[in-house]
Amino acid sequence: MRKEKMSGNLFDEIRSACQAVAERTLQVRIDYDRLASYAATLPLEEVARPTIDPSCHHIGHGEDTLSFFVILDTINFGSGYFPHLQKRPGMSGYFTIASFLTDYCKQNGPFSAQALVGLTTSDCAQIFVQDLVNPPIRELMECFAHALNDLGRFLLARFSGSFHSLIEEADCSAERLVRLLCAMPYFNDVEPYHGVDVPFYKRAQLMASD
């Protein structure tokens, strides 16, 4: 993934890039006449006050909960692999991963930054109860391991291994947190589209939300 030069308001840059993509698309278009009526159907109260499922998330444990969400959001990608994922009954791919991570944290305690650096593909397969014989799942677990290794090294290099110090450094600013996280390759999701660099920063924005 490529580094993106960021200046000004980061979220304005994201919105502007998305607008540029919408204006350049060839196979889809926005029906502006219906945009207002569609927007009126959106459940804004739910968006403003999101809820977290306690059965799938390790909540109520102070700094352990903080580290849980930092780790979960670090690996909140890979939906293209989810058809191959061994899911828990009635759960989506995301909730399957979240619930297995919750189970691991309850049984073994929180991960340290040093532990994240040492995680292997096999470790991830054990944590998330997946079969590495399946090639797409092996690839996903490799990506999870790389992303978590990056997180561990980042925390050790910048924050003496402290999850809390990472959040403190953001100083209650979602934008600053996103900028900090984009120092890691898996968070720096910027892609070119018809001559425009399009920043998504999906996982970084989700971490700020969580």
Identify the role of each PLM range:
Residues 1-210:
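HhH-family (HhH-GPD) DNA N-glycosylase catalytic core used in base-excision repair
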